[in-house]
Design a protein with these regions (language model features):
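Bacterial N-terminal signal peptides that target proteins for export
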Residues: 1-14
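N-terminal signal peptide c-region/cleavage motif recognized by signal peptidases
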Residues: 20-25
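Extracytoplasmic
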Residues: 43-45, 58, 91, 110-112, ...
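Buried hydrophobic-core signal for structured, non-transmembrane domains
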Residues: 46-52, 96, 113-118
Length: 158
């Protein structure tokens, strides 16, 4: 009888742990429209659409660029506007702009940067509330003109 009782307790404990772990998942409210960005040298800028998927609340979206080491930069690429309000279920747009220093990037290979978006939730009216600002980080590739028209028939040859 005690083995049956232990087995039932173990099953109930396992179920409780699984249910609590499932409730800990987080989903960003402000999301970019793609998973990576390619900035061609021939482009002056590229636009990224940010979507607020929250059905009720507006969010602030803070955007910036980092280099391959994770350092925040403002040149040779920058984001405009760096902060914007996006109402619920609406889109916002940011522009990744090339600066004059962009000519100093290598012309024989792509350069890696990271595009970041942090969602900032509105202040809660309730006392003792924990609010979390989630951040999305996606790769941003700067592609020089020498690689823009490379055929993707045999990409391993380049």
């Amino acid at each position: 009888m005690s083995d049956l009782l232990c087995s039932a307790k173990l099953g109930a404990t396992t179920l409780a742990l699984l249910l609590s772990a499932a409730s800990l998942s987080a989903q960003a409210s402000v999301t970019p429209d793609r998973t990576r960005l390619i900035f061609n040298e021939s482009d002056k800028s590229i636009s990224v659409t940010l979507r607020n998927n929250d059905p009720k609340l507006p969010y602030l979206a803070q955007s910036w660029i980092e280099d391959e080491k994770g350092n925040k930069i403002s040149s040779p690429l920058t984001v405009l506007p760096p902060v914007q309000r996006i109402d619920s279920m609406m889109n916002g747009q940011v522009k990744v702009q090339g600066m004059p220093d962009i000519n100093k990037l290598p012309a024989d290979r792509e350069s890696l940067f990271y595009f970041n978006v942090r969602e900032i939730p509105p202040k809660s009216n309730k006392a003792n509330t924990l609010q979390i600002a989630l951040q999305t980080r996606i790769k941003l590739f700067w592609r020089p003109k020498s690689l823009e028209n490379v055929s993707m028939k045999n990409p391993w040859q380049y």
